[in-house]
């Protein structure tokens, strides 16, 4: 018995030592395509092996994480998205980003206790399942090469029949204390030198691929981490480099940030990178407040029964989003409307053309959500404050909200009263 205990202890110590040997990432950047830089001095066989990217995370750790997530999911039911009262601007921004992730994410600023986190988690629970390559740590798409990891693409080129499974859209939380190597991933240099393979432990960006990456209190996150997140969200790729070894993987996700303006604002150059910006406030109507309290109490008493009451509405909204994704490809903003959108951006002195691009995308997504392919002025009117309010130059003496200022210019350009 003592001998067995000593052997088990030495195995655990060896495993722990193997994990500690993973060198934190010093630098990371986003690349538009995957590339590999084999280390010098390695034998030919090792260099060939270096072309394979393997997840270095221990099997038992992954299994433990999977069990923990499942148990938490069962112990903490999600409040239904369709049961959320008010906050229509935030819900619209989230739905449009789900329909067209190229909008570029959404920043949600509002008071404490206004349902920001609840709404975002409810959205992830609402979305349909997706097809992934089985046992792939990057959630690779079995049919789209742009959403495949390098290893999966090599398997496809070799003619291998990929095993496919279904899973829920991943919802990844990024804690404020996360380090850069936890976000981007870690390369095990020791394993690369001794075994001739590039052992890569995926980070949060890999787990969030094809899903939602949520950062609560994003205005308190380190600026360099915000840069990494925004770069990855914009290009769809994450590249980790260390000691001449380079590993890239797809990192396409919907970036959702939330924060309280009382705790500080994001730098304008970072705020501009978010596609949309929603502002929410505390509900003032006493009747709505009573309804919110009543619904929350009912949900806390019997979550399963409460979710059952909203099941039909949830399924209908899910199908509506699926249909909108298909219809989006046929959507079109006519030339006259595009000129007027750009005129509004010019009149508001919006820097760059991100505002023009995002407004056009959001208007098409809203039209698709409403079951149409043609964008109307009403579609543009509903989305343009979300797309432009955070891109305006701040005037400390201004007496009008930025969203209202956008609406005023819209009415002037479109000739609406």
Curated annotation (Swiss-Prot):
Enzyme class: ligase
Xref: SUPFAM superfamilies: P-loop containing nucleoside triphosphate hydrolases
A GO term from the CC aspect: chloroplast
Annotated transmembrane regions: none
Disulfide bonds: 345-387
One example of a Gene Ontology biological process annotation: photosynthesis
Molecular functions (GO terms): ATP binding; ATP hydrolysis activity; magnesium chelatase activity
Chain positions recorded as ATP binding sites: 110-117
Xref: Gene3D superfamilies: Magnesium chelatase subunit I, C-Terminal domain (1.10.8.80), P-loop containing nucleotide triphosphate hydrolases (3.40.50.300)
InterPro entries reported in the protein's UniProt record: AAA+_ATPase, CHLI-like, ChlI/MoxR_AAA_lid, Mg_chelatase_ATPase-isu, Mg_chelatse_chII-like_cat_dom, P-loop_NTPase
Family: Belongs to the Mg-chelatase subunits D/I family.
NCBIfam families: BchI-ChlI
Assembly notes: The magnesium chelatase complex is a heterotrimer consisting of subunits CHLI, CHLD and CHLH.
UniProt protein name: Magnesium-chelatase subunit ChlI, chloroplastic
Source organism (scientific name): Chlamydomonas reinhardtii (Chlamydomonas smithii)
Gene: CHLI
């Amino acid at each position: 018995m003592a001998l067995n205990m000593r052997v088990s202890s030495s195995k655990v110590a060896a495993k722990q030592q193997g994990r500690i040997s993973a060198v934190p990432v010093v630098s990371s950047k986003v690349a538009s395509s995957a590339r590999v830089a084999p280390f010098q001095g390695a034998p030919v066989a090792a260099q060939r092996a270096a072309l394979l990217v393997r997840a270095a995370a221990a099997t038992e750790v992954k299994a433990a994480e999977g069990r923990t997530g499942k148990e938490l999911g069962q112990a903490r039911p999600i409040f239904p998205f369709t049961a959320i009262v008010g906050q229509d601007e935030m819900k619209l921004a989230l739905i449009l980003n789900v329909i067209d992730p190229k909008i570029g994410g959404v920043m949600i600023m509002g008071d404490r206790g206004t349902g920001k986190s609840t709404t975002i988690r409810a959205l992830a629970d609402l979305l349909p399942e997706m097809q992934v390559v089985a046992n792939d740590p990057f959630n690779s798409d079995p049919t789209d090469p742009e959403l495949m990891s390098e290893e999966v693409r090599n398997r496809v080129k070799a003619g291998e029949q990929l095993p496919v499974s279904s899973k829920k859209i991943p919802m990844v939380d990024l804690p404020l204390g996360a380090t850069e190597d936890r976000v981007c991933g870690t390369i095990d240099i020791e394993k690369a030198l001794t075994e001739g393979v590039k052992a890569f432990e995926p980070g949060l960006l890999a787990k969030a691929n094809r899903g939602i990456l949520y950062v609560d209190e994003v205005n308190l996150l380190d600026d360099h981490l915000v840069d990494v997140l925004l770069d990855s969200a914009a290009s769809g790729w994450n590249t980790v480099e260390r000691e001449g070894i380079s590993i890239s993987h797809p990192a396409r996700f919907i970036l959702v940030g939330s924060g309280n303006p009382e705790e500080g604002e994001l730098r304008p150059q970072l705020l501009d990178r978010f596609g949309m910006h929603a502002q929410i406030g505390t509900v003032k109507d006493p009747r709505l407040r009573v309804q919110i309290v009543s619904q929350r109490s009912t949900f806390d008493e019997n979550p399963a029964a409460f979710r059952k009451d909203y099941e039909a509405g949830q399924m209908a909204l899910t199908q509506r989003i699926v249909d909108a994704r298909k219809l989006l490809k046929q959507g079109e903003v006519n030339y006259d409307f595009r000129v007027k959108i750009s005129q509004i951006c010019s009149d508001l002195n919006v820097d760059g053309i991100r505002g023009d691009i995002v407004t056009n995308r959001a208007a098409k997504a809203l039209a698709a959500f409403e079951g149409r392919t043609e964008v109307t002025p009403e579609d543009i009117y509903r989305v343009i404050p979300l797309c432009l309010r955070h891109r305006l130059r701040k005037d400390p003496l201004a007496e009008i909200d930025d969203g209202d200022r956008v609406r005023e210019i819209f009415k002037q350009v479109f000739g609406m009263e």
